[in-house]
Each structure stands twice: as C-alpha cells, then as structure tokens.
Amino acid sequence: MKEGEHKKYGPDRNFRRRLLLFLGGVLGGWTGMAAQSACLVESSADFQAAALQEERSFLDTLSVRLEKGDVAGAVNYGNFVLQQDSTEAGKAVKAYEIAVELGQKDAYVEAASFCKKALSYDIFFGKAHLLLARLYAAHPCWTEERALNQCTYYLVLDNLIRAKQLDVALEKESDELLALYSKKLPTRKDLFMLGYTTGDRVHIGGWIGESIIIR
C-alpha cells in the first residue's frame, strides 16, 4: 500500500478495530450481567426454598416431640426457635405456628401461651386472636358452676371480634363463630342467682386467667 493510501485508510481500520473491541466489551458485559442476574434469581429461589425447608423442618421436629408426648420438650424447643429469629414479625409467625401444633395435640394451655407470645411480638396478629378464641371455646370449664364456665364465652367473643377487626380475611370465619358461641352465653337469671349482673367483672380462673365484663 502506498503511503498516501495508508494515511487514507489506516485511521479507518484502527477505528473499526477499536469499535469491534468496544462492542466486544459491551456484549461481554451484557453476558456477564445476564449471568449475574440469573445467579441472583437462582440464589433468591434457593434462599426461599431453604427458608421454607427450615420452617418445615422446625415444625416437623416439634411435631415429633409432641407425638412422643414430650410437651415440655416441645415447648422448650419452640422457645429456642423463637430465640433464633432476629425479627419481631418472624417471631410472631413462628409463635403462632407453634401454637397451632400444640393446639392440635390438645396441649391447649401451652398453645394459648404461644398465642399470647405471638401477640406480644405483633399486637395486630388477628390469627392469634382467632386461635385463642378456638382454644377457649374448646376448653371453657374452670369451675363447678355451669354459669361461670359459660362466662368463658364472653372471652371467646372478645377474641373473635378482635380477630376480624385486625384481619379482614378472618371476618367470615369470625362471624360464623360469633353466631355459634353467642348462643352459649349464660342467662341473666343464672348469673343473678350467683350474685352477678350486667357490667360486673368476672375473673375466668383455672388455666385461662383472664377477666371479662358481663354484658
């Protein structure tokens, strides 16, 4: 090539070479970003799967202890699980799930305790109120007086009302239970015979340990 031709075409070739190198770098960057994005998606999926497996694992462990009749061991393990969670929201969910497991094995005293723990972590946890209502309704007796045992249903109604106030998704179920358990309240006559009237406070003793207002 003549010197004039080199001067004429040389710079264009250099430019094309630099352009190809630049485009190669951009395409390589895009490829790297795509690979990185894929890794992030995969990592996110792995994390979610691991979290789900961990949750299922602790519930399985809890269930095994309960199947063996080791309620105390299940409670201790449940408390240990709560200590491992670093967030109040996470603790609330786990406490509720533990309460469900305990309730299914008829460990209602311990189940109620974990419901209250869930509410201590999240006062707006409607499901915990709903479960408390179910536990109280399933085990209302704490005295030999029938009318006083029926006062437990005031507590049931209070928790059902609170549950639907906090969680709209629980409204239908709560209303159905409200209609059912409102029929189990003591009559005014029965309460009057025991010296109680509307507006009086009654302490629900036994395993419950809560107070209600007669209305």
Enumerate the predicted regions with their spans.
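Generic helix N-cap/helix-start motif at coil->alpha-helix transitions
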Residues: Q36-V41, A45, A49-D60, T87-A95, ...
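Bacterial Sec-dependent N-terminal signal peptides
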Residues: M1-V41
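Terminal, low-structured helical/coil segments at or just beyond the last alpha-helical repeat
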Residues: Q165-R215
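TPR/TPR-like (Sel1-like) alpha-helical repeat modules
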Residues: S120, L148-L170, A179
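Residue-level recognition of tetratricopeptide repeat
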Residues: E88-K91, F125, L170-E171
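Short coil/turn linking the two alpha-helices of tandem helical-hairpin repeats
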Residues: V100-D106, A133, A138-L148, A179, ...
